[in-house]
């Protein structure tokens, strides 16, 4: 396996990087930052399509790409345990979810137009935690992002207990190492192409996460949290980083049986480790 770095907007560079590749794993995606919508789209959408086309030109057998649980959207009729057959209906305001869902649709169209390959593998991870996970380190926008790591790592060691609002909503977490194992199985396993849900076993709540971090949860009823999140999500001129509040409006809990059966994948990290290593430290 070889890691290659480059600009996904540069088609020539992508073709050079994909030359003679048997499988291409593409993870580049802009999640936070101050870039314009046009710049973000040029990386997230056009850049990923460029990568797929370069892989096809190189004769790669497989193209593995990371989508997200957010592609399902956060809707009141979401069942607990959505399978990969559940429709992709992204959140109304969250650009990240909208672009992941659009990307799935466009990649499927590209793959259908090329019956000889590459075969398309789409992973839909839940909330990813770990020392290198972007979402765990960039909860605050722009120059404030480094504060997240410091606050999380020090809060549990303060002499005065810190209370944190903890909505009583079900959550799924997955450790970055388990996502890495799923990506590897997409590369080497015999499982068929398509979408795969990736999440740790079991369902927890925000209060569980808060306690594992050494903080004191201040319970918030699920109904109140959902109402507040829905109200905030509809506010005009909501900045991109604040759009994530829509994820708290309704749960999105996935079934991972297909990945376990078809890919031979299983999460190895317990919930306690997933919670305790969001920004480094084990």
Predicted segments with their positions:
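Amphipathic terminal alpha-helices
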Residues: 258-261, 269-282
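Short-chain dehydrogenase/reductase
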Residues: 39-42, 81-82, 92-104, 137, ...
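NAD(P)-dependent short-chain dehydrogenase/reductase
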Residues: 118-170
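Conserved Rossmann-fold NAD(P)-dependent oxidoreductase catalytic core, especially the SDR/UDP-sugar
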Residues: 46, 50-96
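Mid/C-terminal beta-alpha module of Rossmann-like enzyme folds, strongest
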Residues: 180-240, 256, 276-277
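Active-site Tyr-X1-5-Lys
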Residues: 92-124, 131
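NAD(P)H-binding glycine-rich loop region in Rossmannoid oxidoreductase-like domains
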Residues: 5-46, 54, 73-74
């Amino acid at each position: 396996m070889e890691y290659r770095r480059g600009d996904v907007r540069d088609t020539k560079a992508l073709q050079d990087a994909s030359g003679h590749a048997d499988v291409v794993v593409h993870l580049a995606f802009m999640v936070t930052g101050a870039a314009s919508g046009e710049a973000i789209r040029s990386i997230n959408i056009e850049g990923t399509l460029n990568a797929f086309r370069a892989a096809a030109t190189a004769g790669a057998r497989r193209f593995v790409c990371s989508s997200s649980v957010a592609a399902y959207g956060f809707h009141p009729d979401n069942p607990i345990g959505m399978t990969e057959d559940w429709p992709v209906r992204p959140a109304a305001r969250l650009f990240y979810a909208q672009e992941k869902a659009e990307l799935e649709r466009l990649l499927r169209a590209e793959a259908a137009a090329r019956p000889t390959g590459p075969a398309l593998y789409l992973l839909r991870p839940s909330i990813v935690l770990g020392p290198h996970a972007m979402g765990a380190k960039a909860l605050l926008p722009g120059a404030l992002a480094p504060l997240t790591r410091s606050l999380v790592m020090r809060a549990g060691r303060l002499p005065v207990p810190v209370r944190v609002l903890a909505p009583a909503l079900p959550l799924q977490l997955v450790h970055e190492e388990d996502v890495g194992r799923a990506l590897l199985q997409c590369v080497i396993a015999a499982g068929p192409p398509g979408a795969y849900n990736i999440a740790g076993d079991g369902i927890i709540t925000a209060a569980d996460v808060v306690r594992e971090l050494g903080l004191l949860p201040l319970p918030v009823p699920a109904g109140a949290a959902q109402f507040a999140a829905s109200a905030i999500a509809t506010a005009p001129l909501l900045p991109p980083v604040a759009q994530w509040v829509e994820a708290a409006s309704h749960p999105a809990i996935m079934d991972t049986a297909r990945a376990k059966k078809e890919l031979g994948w299983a999460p190895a990290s317990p919930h306690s480790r997933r919670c305790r290593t969001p920004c480094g430290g084990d």
